[in-house]
């Protein structure tokens, strides 16, 4: 999607009433063993809606995609970030990205890249230093194109999978 095509979307924090849409998108984007549970996603939205960035399709009024993370002072991703909202540190220097969820009909158009870019800019303005994430082998190249560095195998067994740890500097 060109920048002009991004005008089709409103980029903003998630609203509580959009929780069912976020749960639906998560279940579409990830297999059951990898998806965040509806309970955990609901808790995270209630606790830190400001750590979500959504792309709402202005034509349909529906969420096309979202990105969410956990602010922390930690420098390594761990699986507990997915389930334990007590790990949220609103003043944390880093963000552990938990999911980039793009509905299938909006993929391959640059929307994921746009969300990551806007999210990084927003969090850098808050004084954050780095974004961290984990991804499967087949997504490493995509995140490298977004500017992330592959840090090797992650200390994660989420969903019974082997994950790559990746990071990108966003602030000074």
Where are these regions (language model features)?
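Conserved GNAT acetyl-CoA-binding A-motif
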Residues: 95, 116, 122-136
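Residue-level recognition of the GNAT/N-acetyltransferase active site
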Residues: 15, 98, 103, 136
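Active-site rim helix/loop that mediates acceptor-substrate recognition in acyltransferases
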Residues: 31-59, 66-87
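Conserved catalytic-core motifs of GNAT/GCN5-like acyltransferases
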Residues: 71-74, 132-134, 144, 149-165
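Conserved acyl-donor/pantetheine-binding loop and adjacent beta-alpha core of acyl/acetyltransferases
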Residues: 62-100, 107, 157-162
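Helix-loop element at the rim of GNAT/NAT acetyltransferase active sites that forms part
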Residues: 13, 24-37
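Conserved acetyl-CoA-binding loop-helix of GNAT-fold acetyltransferases
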Residues: 102, 108-121
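A short beta-loop-alpha structural element at the N-terminal edge
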Residues: 8-22
């Amino acid at each position: 999607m060109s920048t002009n095509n991004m005008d089709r979307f409103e980029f903003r924090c998630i609203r509580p009433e959009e929780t069912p849409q976020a749960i639906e998108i998560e279940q579409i984007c990830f297999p059951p063993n990898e998806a965040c549970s509806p309970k955990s996603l609901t808790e995270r939205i209630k606790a830190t809606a400001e750590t979500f960035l959504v792309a709402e399709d202005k034509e349909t009024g529906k969420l096309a995609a979202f990105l969410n993370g956990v602010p922390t002072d930690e420098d390594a991703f761990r699986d507990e970030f997915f389930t334990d909202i007590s790990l949220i540190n609103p003043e944390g220097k880093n963000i552990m990205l938990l999911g980039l969820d793009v509905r299938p009909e909006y993929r391959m158009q640059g929307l994921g890249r746009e969300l990551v870019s806007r999210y990084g800019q927003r969090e850098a303005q808050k004084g954050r230093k780095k974004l961290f994430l984990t991804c499967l082998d087949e997504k490493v190249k995509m995140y490298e194109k977004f500017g992330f560095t592959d840090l090797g195998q992650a200390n994660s067994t989420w969903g019974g999978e082997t994950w790559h740890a990746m990071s990108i500097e966003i602030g000074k």
